[in-house]
């Protein structure tokens, strides 16, 4: 039996963190919200991803939340619910004069 002697990370790169979070966002929240960057925090061993609301016709309107992923396990360790992100996105869109998300 082979024994794993080199630790493996579930989410080793920023690109993989962004891909995972965007898949969740687009499935649960909608296509207008996305993550474009992920920053690694070595103290918590988590990826931090700001969630932005953007429209092709208006560009990026702003950040509506943050997601935290544990790099070793791949688990979401902090995120607003899908319903909360939708509420925040609708509020920001309305404040910018855009109807609906």
Where are these regions (language model features)?
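Long, terminal "pre-/pro-" and other extracytoplasmic accessory regions
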Residues: 1-101
């Amino acid at each position: 039996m082979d024994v794993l002697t080199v630790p493996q990370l579930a989410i080793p790169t920023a690109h993989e963190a962004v891909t995972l979070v965007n898949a969740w966002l687009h499935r649960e929240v909608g296509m207008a919200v996305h993550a474009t960057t992920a920053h690694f925090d070595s103290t918590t061993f988590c990826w931090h991803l700001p969630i932005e609301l953007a429209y092709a016709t208006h560009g990026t309107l702003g950040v509506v939340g943050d997601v935290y992923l544990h790099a070793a396990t791949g688990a979401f360790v902090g995120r607003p619910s899908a319903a909360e992100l939708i509420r925040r996105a609708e509020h920001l869109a309305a404040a910018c004069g855009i109807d609906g998300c």
